[in-house]
Amino acid sequence: MSRILEQTVERAAQHIATHFYGKYRGIVTDIADPDNRCRIKARVPAVLDDQVSTWAEASLPFAGDGHGLVMLPVVGDGVWIEFEAGNLNQPIWSGCIVPSGGRPDPQGERVRVIVTDGGHKVVLDEENDEVKLVHPMGGELTIGATEIVMKLGACELKMSPTEISLNNGMVKVTVAGVSLVNDAMKLGA
């Protein structure tokens, strides 16, 4: 084998031995990025054994100076880690791994859900044509094409294009006036 070919093979072998391409499973260990750039640290056993990565850059669908989509994983979550140009010193987290049975409710082919680890929920429901905000302690706001409903405990407020109803019709406000249940009192027409 010629000397040039041997050197080329040696360099290629060294490059392959020190560079890691593709995606690797990782576990988040830190999200407190001191530079506030959505970076994380993770354990990546297949590549780093027991060591923790350096700060992994975020690969986000929308980001810029002072704007973007920010959804950091929680410490302990599974993430996909890759390395820029295969360099172990330049990790990138490119997404999260959904654990078995881990998809949040509600579920459906045309239902998009964002749920925080604290239970705050945003539901974009194309099947029922509504948007819902849900607080883990019970508050709920549902916006549909023809109705908006706010619930908190035993209280409920419904608003349609023609009326506002409190507590299942106990109080109604319409363009004609205000009425109490069973017309006990009316103001207006």
Go through the PLM ranges and name each one.
Residues 43-49, 53, 76-80:
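Catalytic cores of peptidoglycan-degrading enzymes
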